[in-house]
């Protein structure tokens, strides 16, 4: 289980990403579409002043059950370990154990 502080940090990042998503996209579009050097520089400065944690790259999807940051399936919001446990118990329908 991940520490509560890590889970809270990720939830805070998720809120910041959603809050600044539109503003960040507008500035990026302005930078890409503009031909004026001055406008580009001003837009880049505004983009740099946005909170660092509002960048979507910094947001990590975590397992809803244990908080593990790696190997999380988006469809279930569970890591591979918890997903297997839930499949074996029968909480997720349609799963079957592989054999080859």
From Swiss-Prot:
It comes from the Bacteria. Binds 1 zinc ion per subunit. Zn(2+) binds at residues 63, 66, 79, 82. Signal peptide: none annotated. Coiled coil: none annotated. Disulfide bonds: none annotated. InterPro entries: Ribosomal_uS14, Ribosomal_uS14_bac/plastid, Ribosomal_uS14_CS. Binds 16S rRNA, required for the assembly of 30S particles and may also be responsible for determining the conformation of the 16S rRNA at the A site. This is Small ribosomal subunit protein uS14. The lineage of its organism: Bacteria, Pseudomonadati, Pseudomonadota, Gammaproteobacteria, Legionellales.
